[in-house]
UniProtKB/Swiss-Prot annotation:
This is Testin. The gene is TES. One of its GO terms (biological process) is negative regulation of cell population proliferation. It is found in: Cytoplasm; Cell junction, Focal adhesion. Transmembrane segments: none annotated. GO terms for cellular component: cytoplasm; focal adhesion. It comes from Otolemur garnettii (Small-eared galago). The keyword Zinc applies.
């Protein structure tokens, strides 16, 4: 597919998940409606991952595309209908042991994902070593956690130009080169093994200086001794705690045979969340989720959440922005050269701030302009003026004076307070 065709196919899938309820805002949100370039709901401003959207096939396509043209292509299957790679995630159904009684239904547990190992007992152990609220049991809090992390850690717009907003042909080409590079140099999938299996399959790094045929017996003895030592001492690369020989460990090929992790310790070094489906990115001796690996390589637009491939972009409030995306979070008007106020780390233009976010003066009951000085005590505010910050009894100006606050009112003295009580 050429660049021009890819640009024509670009779209954010606005019909996807339309009307889905927000898990965070509940009934306050009218239902999911994707903003035309931000990756958030237009109604409640929460992200797509905060909504109860059925995305199983879409997520499997996304991960399938990630593994395409990599050594992990065995984890995908291409549909005959459209040739789109689909992630063959391993679903595990476990039957819990129950006493042999008549008329007793079999109790089964379905995991929406499980490590693809032949030893089901090892997979069961792996799941039990995860925090219960993060075990991806179908219909549980853990399954919702996995779904949210798939969206957060592996954004489709970090690998697919057609999921981005109005990229130029040059930006599409740069993005494709970037994706190819991280697939070749950083992408990996963890493997669940027993600690001794990982260490035993690693290359023997022991070196005996001056060795010859006459020392073969001694070398063999030393190798055996070293082998025994390695089989009884295993430490987690993350927490540094000892690992039990019979417990499952995670091995990451790009990290090397000398590094192992507890299942609950196989986390991103930035957000410290479990690496979803054990998909990791390795850089500078650290594990990253897809999002934070990309953040370490490219600036990310705080407006649209996409990586920036343009040479020109804006930096403001310790964040990066596409030139066209440095906009008011409420009305989307461009803020270049305009006065704005940061509200929850989002820029808001002055009119929207006064209308939607400004605190109300207890004196005149009008919104307080962001550029105007004010007096604040607990949850109450006043214009810092002789007309507003006054004694609620005698109207004496209290600027620079001691005062007594009582339920939104202020008094200059005990006498005035008693007169109003």
């Amino acid at each position: 597919m050429d660049v021009e065709t890819k640009i024509k196919k670009m779209g954010l899938g606005h019909e996807q998940g339309f009307g889905a309820p927000c898990l965070k805002c509940k009934e306050k949100c009218e239902g999911f409606e994707l903003h035309f370039w931000r990756k958030i709901c237009r109604n409640c401003k929460c992200g797509q991952e905060e909504h109860d959207i059925l995305l199983s096939n879409e997520e499997d396509r996304k991960v399938g595309r990630l593994f395409e043209d990599t050594k992990y292509s065995t984890l995908i299957a291409k549909l005959k209908s459209d040739g789109i790679p689909m992630y063959k995630r391993n679903v595990m159904i476990l039957t819990n042991p129950v006493p042999a009684k008549k008329n007793v239904s079999i109790n089964t547990v379905t995991y929406e994902w499980a490590p693809p190992v032949q030893n089901q007992a090892l997979a069961r152990q792996y799941m039990q070593m995860l925090p219960k609220e993060k075990q991806p049991v179908a219909g549980s809090e853990g399954a919702q956690y996995r779904k949210k992390q798939l969206a957060k850690q592996l954004p489709a717009h970090d690998q697919d130009p057609t999921k981005c907003h109005e990229l130029s042909p040059k930006e599409v080409k740069e993005m494709e080169q970037f994706v190819k590079k991280y697939k070749n140099e950083a992408l990996g999938v963890g493997d669940v093994k027993l600690p001794r299996e990982v260490v035993d399959q690693g290359p023997n790094q022991m070196y005996i200086p001056g060795g010859d045929r006459s020392t073969s017996a001694a070398v063999g003895a030393m190798e055996n001794k070293s082998h025994e030592h390695r089989r009884t001492h295993y430490a987690c690369y993350c927490c540094k705690m000892n690992m039990k020989e019979g417990d499952p460990a995670i091995y990451a090929e790009r990290a090397g045979y000398d590094k192992l992790w507890h299942p609950a310790c196989f986390v991103c070094s930035i957000c410290y969340e479990l690496l979803v489906d054990m998909i990791y990115f390795w850089k500078n001796e650290k594990l990253y989720c897809g999002r934070h690996y990309c953040d370490s390589e490219k600036p990310r637009c705080a407006g649209c959440d996409e990586l920036i491939f343009s040479n020109e972009y804006t930096q403001a409030e310790n964040q990066n922005w596409h030139l066209k995306h440095f906009c008011c979070f409420d009305c989307d008007n461009v803020l270049a050269g305009e006065i704005y106020v940061m509200v929850n780390d989002k820029p808001v233009c002055k009119p929207c701030y006064v209308k939607n976010h400004a605190v109300v003066c207890q004196g005149c009951h009008n919104a307080i302009d962001p550029e105007v000085q004010r007096v604040t005590y607990n949850n109450f505010s006043w214009h810092a003026s002789t007309e507003c910050f006054l004694c609620s009894c005698c109207s004496k100006c209290l600027i620079g004076q001691k005062f007594m606050p009582v339920e939104g009112m202020v008094f200059c003295s005990v006498k005035c307070k008693k007169m109003m009580s």
